[in-house]
Amino acid sequence: MDTLNVKGIRAYGYTGYFDAEQFLGQWFEVDLTIWIDLAKAGQSDDLNDTLNYADAVAIVQKLIRESKFKMIEKLAEAIADAILGTGKTQQVKVALTKCQAPIPDFDGDVTLEILRSR
């Protein structure tokens, strides 16, 4: 199986456990690894025979911007479900980063990775 990697998808969203996160929002970043059979697209040179990665970016950004989940696990699941829902993918890995997580004395970020198949 082939893979399509889309990295560095950023959007401002309102998912978070604390009220301030859902009110003020924060930046999220997503990396996708999409398992897809690219043989037909490689032969046909037709965008309809693959997953348009611009569409994948738009799906992720829309979910980040419009969702107000408490848990990043829920947001990652929604992203995986939407990518698998295109019908063109067999499996997807979603690496969802909460940039600047609100943790005292912590200046890093937190990344959650999930792997889902249909």
From Swiss-Prot:
Top-level class of the enzyme under EC nomenclature: lyase
SUPFAM superfamilies per record: Tetrahydrobiopterin biosynthesis enzymes-like
InterPro entries named among the record's database cross-references: Dihydroneopterin_aldolase, FolB_dom, GTP-CH-I_C/QueF
Gene Ontology biological process terms, A to Z: folic acid biosynthetic process; tetrahydrofolate biosynthetic process
Family named by the database record: Belongs to the DHNA family.
Function statement: Catalyzes the conversion of 7,8-dihydroneopterin to 6-hydroxymethyl-7,8-dihydropterin.
Name of the protein: Probable dihydroneopterin aldolase
